[in-house]
């Protein structure tokens, strides 16, 4: 029995390479939005949730996100969406519905494959009402752009922190430099100061000696026979 080997030619290799490189088969980039995922009435959903909050639950927010254009807003929404999901697990049925309504407005961030959060990220405790207000602000910032002028957010997949302030020198104006930076005294400057003070010291000594001599002379005139001090 003869087994026929499949025909293979350079044209087959070229065809396979073209298929692998085809953008249609590779899919869209991560964090890509061809249309705006933000609804026109998202503020109403946030307002309803805020109005029904019986307790201002404590949450945390990142305070040192890098101020990267459009990325910072996306990062803030990504962190807020994690909190909304967590609050849904402990909320009552009515609150769960309101939380889910808000979650649908920011759930689009889950389509982005973000990298693990960096260790440099710092969080502070705040209340859920503050988080909702900030989230609404970030949606307002993204709405005019996302799905329109800006569609590909793949450069935002790595959450970045601001540089540590302890390693940076604060900016200082020339006026501030003139007001705060005084030159340190140097030995040469001290010597110059002593040379300037020396003539004044000699003048004062001479004046004191002359005054003393005049007083002694007057005493000699009043009491003859008392020797006067010799003048240098």
UniProtKB/Swiss-Prot annotation:
GO terms for molecular function: cytokine activity; identical protein binding; receptor tyrosine kinase binding. It comes from the Eukaryota. The chain crosses the membrane at residues 190-210. It is found in: Cell membrane. It is a single-pass type I membrane protein. Residues 211-232 are cytoplasmic. GO terms for cellular component: cell surface; external side of plasma membrane; extracellular region; extracellular space. Disulfide bonds join 31-112, 71-156, 120-161. Pfam families: Flt3_lig. InterPro entries: 4_helix_cytokine-like_core, Flt3_lig. Residues 27-189 are extracellular. Glycans are attached at residues 127, 152. The keyword RNA-binding does not apply. GO terms for biological process: B cell differentiation; dendritic cell differentiation; homeostasis of number of cells within a tissue; lymphocyte differentiation; natural killer cell differentiation; negative regulation of apoptotic process in bone marrow cell; positive regulation of cell cycle; positive regulation of cell population proliferation. Residues 1-26 form the signal peptide. Keywords: Cell membrane, Cytokine, Disulfide bond, Glycoprotein, Membrane, Secreted, Signal, Transmembrane, Transmembrane helix. Its main location: membrane. Stimulates the proliferation of early hematopoietic cells by activating FLT3. Synergizes well with a number of other colony stimulating factors and interleukins. Essential for the development of natural killer (NK) cells, B cells, and dendritic cells (DCs). Homodimer (soluble isoform). This is Fms-related tyrosine kinase 3 ligand.
